[in-house]
């Protein structure tokens, strides 16, 4: 099984790491090409490009100036312990037993506007560059177009013929994958909550549930679509009436 998730805007470079293990990102050459473009942007340009405050623009301008390769444990940090948003709250990577790290490293991939595709233990330096940023890179008119061939080829290389491919990323990030070119079907779980008698997709809960689904897969060694349907963390359960084919809906 392979799983893709989105990165997070929030980063944590302070928390003590539970392991000294790390790996090198696969696409640093391509990341340097993207970085070369973003490094030239002034804070005012970053603010407009990313629709962020002046304070955040200044912070990310500094990050862009400081970013450099090669990555080492002294100047970079494993991705799964660095991203700090709702998905990662649900995943709670810090509490994953170390004997399960190999499974996490094998199954999980993180889509990224700067790094393309990261394994959990891949080193990364601080950045902010969402996949939907309308920034031309070379002959590509945006980051989706730049990353799509590389990311899709990498996923196809890793996916075995009958392996499950689970999309737990946002639409913004998953659009960097050429679904038609994938050699396996895509399974897409959705998570909805009943509120005021109505079933809704509530962003915070849905993001957290995506992380919890990754954790469930690792905790239970899930391999089949029926295994996925057994997801029951924090009150969610599979809804057969709302689900169709490879679109799995979980409600609570």
UniProtKB/Swiss-Prot annotation:
InterPro entries: YaaA. Pfam families: H2O2_YaaD. Belongs to the UPF0246 family. It comes from Flavobacterium johnsoniae (strain ATCC 17061 / DSM 2064 / JCM 8514 / BCRC 14874 / CCUG 350202 / NBRC 14942 / NCIMB 11054 / UW101). It comes from the Bacteria. The lineage of its organism: Bacteria, Pseudomonadati, Bacteroidota, Flavobacteriia, Flavobacteriales. One of its GO terms (cellular component) is cytosol. PANTHER family: PEROXIDE STRESS RESISTANCE PROTEIN YAAA, PEROXIDE STRESS RESPONSE PROTEIN YAAA. Signal peptide: none annotated. This is UPF0246 protein Fjoh_4905. One of its GO terms (biological process) is response to hydroperoxide.
């Amino acid at each position: 099984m392979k799983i893709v998730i989105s990165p997070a805007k929030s980063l944590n470079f302070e928390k003590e790491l539970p392991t000294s293990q790390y790996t090198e990102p696969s696409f640093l050459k391509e990341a340097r090409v993207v970085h070369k473009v973003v490094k030239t942007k002034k804070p005012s340009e970053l603010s407009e490009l990313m629709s962020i405050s002046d304070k955040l623009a200044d912070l990310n301008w500094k990050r862009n100036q400081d970013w450099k390769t090669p990555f080492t444990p002294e100047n970079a940090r494993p991705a799964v312990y660095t991203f700090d948003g709702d998905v990662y709250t649900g995943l709670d990577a810090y509490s994953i037993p170390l004997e399960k790290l190999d499974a996490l490293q094998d199954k999980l991939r993180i889509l990224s506007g700067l790094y393309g595709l990261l394994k959990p233990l891949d080193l990364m330096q601080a950045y902010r560059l969402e996949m939907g940023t309308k920034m031309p890179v070379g002959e590509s008119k945006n980051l989706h177009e730049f990353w799509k061939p590389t990311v899709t080829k990498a996923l196809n290389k890793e996916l075995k013929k009958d392996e499950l491919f689970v999309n737990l990323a946002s639409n913004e990030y998953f659009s960097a994958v050429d679904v038609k070119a994938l050699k396996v079907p895509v399974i897409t779980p959705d998570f909805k909550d009943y509120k005021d008698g109505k079933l809704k997709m509530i962003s915070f809960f849905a993001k957290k549930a995506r992380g919890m689904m990754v954790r469930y897969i690792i905790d239970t060694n899930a391999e089949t679509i029926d295994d996925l349907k057994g997801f029951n963390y924090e009150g969610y359960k599979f809804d057969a009436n709302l689900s169709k084919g490879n679109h799995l809906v979980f409600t609570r």
